[in-house]
Amino acid sequence: MTIIDCHVHLNHYEGTKYLPLEERTELLLRTMREGNVDHSIVLSSYKVNPDRPSTEQLIEVTKKHDNLSIVAGFSIDGHNDNDFQNCRRWLQDGLIKGMKLYCGYEHYYPYDERYQRVYDLCIEFGVPVMIHTGDTYTSKGKLRFAHPLNIDEVAVDNPELKIIICHLGNPWIQDCEEVIYKNKNAYADISGLVLGEFTHYFEDFMADKVKEFLNYAGEPRYLLYGSDWPLSNMDSYLNFAAKLELAQHSRELLMFRNAQALFKI
């Protein structure tokens, strides 16, 4: 079966061995080959520094690899008008597949009016916006900005906008269920539910949560497979997804068809 991982990073994270960006890219490609992952979508960050490459750097380092696509991170504090115009140009040229907001990491609600130009741009080019929800990797994140219920306002006010709620809003998965059920323009990825590898107990626990999600919101036409590599182990995540009790058609929707349609891959 085709596999699209819609949520990976090429950042260097504290506590891991530092590798130059080119070597990180090769590590991602090797990990994909080992897991039979056909395509990955690389997300740039809400800030640029030696550990977090810019969208432009990611475009450059992945341009030789047809199995890697880019989603551009955008922030209120870390990006300016010139950065925004670059995103427009990259969308026009087909170099990025969508936009990503990091609510919680930066302390603004997703319905802050300063994000509206990002939503308008995504609507104009027919691409999704991905929005961080739930727990943050850093303790400096502020969780009230990352609650999935905040996405409801964006979905209602922008009915033509395709929104991907990252991480199922974990730990507020039940609230994310309602946002998805209510808003037909809202989707969610299952990435980043664990740091590192799943333990047997936690794997069963999260599988039950995903099952409950599906039972509440219906057919998984709105769920996308993603890992959050390298924060989450790709092989462990693939094993987790394989154990989800899904009919073949539903599994295909989760593992590649939904992402294929949303990101036009």
Where are these regions (language model features)?
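Mid-to-C-terminal alpha-helical segments outside catalytic/metal-binding sites
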Residues: 1-10, 19-39, 218-222, 232-265
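Active-site neighborhood of phospho(di)ester-bond hydrolases with catalytic His/Asp-centered motifs
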Residues: 3-6, 41-44, 71-73, 100, ...
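Conserved, mostly hydrophobic/aromatic
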Residues: 7, 32, 58, 99, ...
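Histidine-centered divalent metal-coordination motifs
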Residues: 7-13, 132, 167
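Acidic/histidine-rich helix-loop elements
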Residues: 10-23, 136-138, 197-198
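Active-site gating/metal-coordination segments in enzymes
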Residues: 38-39, 49-145
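Short, well-ordered alpha-helical microsegments
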Residues: 51, 172-176, 234-235
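Catalytic pocket-lining loop regions of alpha/beta-barrel enzymes
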Residues: 94-98, 111-224
